[in-house]
């Protein structure tokens, strides 16, 4: 199989490394308008690059494309790839105004579309989803990290999270909602508070407190921000017969044994793959697992865990939360 990775920034290079690790037989080429990025990928990963997508498609003749550019450009790139007959894998999308046309084009061209939703491939999320099944629970969840610490090697003003249309809080909401809905159920009511509490040079709220009512009776409080100086994900779930804790890392999942009155650690990983440039709650395992899932999807072995149809509804929900007064 031949794969084109479009966008050779941090996510594109991560995907190349993990594709090489997943299946060394996959042929890879890259696309990026920045010569320095193409050269870095050539030097570090042995991957040739193009500066033009059309030329890359014509000359490399790929079977599939990984779209790893800024989310604001995903739509145009995805449509060009689909119209050229390529299966596509997109990183998280923060705009859904192109979804209907893409789904229609994919059907016409007999192409497959796969959307990254990395947390659905975390083993802890799989465990939590099963643990709360058929229970009525409440949960409290905080997901936050100070925006300048996201990419310490560059200014936050230099990438998409500073753009109001694809802002940092919108991204985190779009990352978290797919697994929150899969685990706790369809959302039927939402109430939110938001404000700007920092001196960050952004024109959007930097924190949200969101109350969620789920169709099955579950309720949650979701606190999301780009303020917390210690990047963290912290979840507490409780019911009459369950008390569960998770701090976003593979080592931090535990349940309370109410008979012995002590926390029991839940270890789900034989090996954890970590990139130390990122916060402790970001691990490589799930990124690789969703690449495997994409390849399996292309081979007819498994279906995506998150669809564009589902994601369209989630992005509409995020827009509603952003627009609430």
Range-by-range predicted roles:
Residues 46-53:
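Conserved SAM-binding strand-loop segment of SAM-dependent methyltransferases
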Residues 63-64, 138:
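Short, Asp-centered acidic motifs that coordinate Mg2+ and/or phosphate
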Residues 64, 70-71, 75-120:
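Beta-strand-loop-alpha-helix segment that lines the small-molecule cofactor/substrate pocket
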Residues 171-254, 281, 288-301:
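Contiguous beta-strand/loop segments that form the cofactor/metal-binding neighborhood of enzyme cores
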């Amino acid at each position: 199989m031949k794969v084109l990775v479009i966008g050779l920034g941090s996510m594109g290079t991560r995907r190349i490394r993990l594709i090489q690790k997943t299946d060394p037989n996959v042929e890879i080429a890259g696309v990026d308008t920045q010569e320095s990025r193409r050269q870095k990928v050539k030097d570090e990963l042995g991957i040739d690059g193009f500066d033009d997508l059309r030329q890359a498609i014509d000359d490399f003749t790929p079977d599939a494309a990984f779209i790893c550019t800024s989310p604001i450009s995903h739509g145009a790139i995805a449509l060009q790839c689909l119209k050229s007959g390529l299966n596509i894998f997109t990183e998280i999308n923060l705009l859904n105004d192109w979804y209907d046309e893409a789904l229609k084009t994919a059907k016409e061209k007999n192409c497959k579309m796969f959307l990254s939703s990395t947390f659905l491939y975390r083993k802890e999320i799989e465990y939590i989803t099963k643990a709360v099944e058929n229970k009525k629970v409440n949960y409290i969840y905080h997901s936050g990290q100070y925006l300048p610490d996201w990419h310490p090697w560059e200014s936050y003003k230099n990438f998409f999270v500073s753009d109001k249309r694809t802002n940092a809080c919108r991204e985190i909401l779009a990352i978290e909602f797919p697994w929150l809905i899969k685990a706790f159920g369809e959302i039927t009511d939402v109430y939110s508070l938001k404000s700007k509490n920092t001196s960050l040079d952004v024109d959007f709220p930097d924190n949200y407190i969101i109350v969620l009512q789920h169709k099955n009776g579950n309720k949650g409080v979701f606190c999301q921000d780009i303020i917390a100086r210690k990047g963290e994900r912290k979840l507490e779930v409780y019911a009459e017969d369950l008390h569960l804790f998770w701090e976003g890392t593979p080592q931090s999942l535990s349940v309370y044994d109410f008979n012995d009155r002590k926390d029991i650690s839940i270890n789900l990983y034989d090996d954890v793959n970590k990139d130390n440039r990122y916060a402790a709650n970001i691990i490589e395992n799930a990124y690789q697992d969703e690449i495997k899932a994409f390849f399996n999807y292309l081979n007819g072995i498994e279906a995506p865990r998150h669809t564009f149809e589902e994601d369209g509804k989630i992005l509409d929900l995020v827009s509603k939360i952003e627009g609430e007064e």
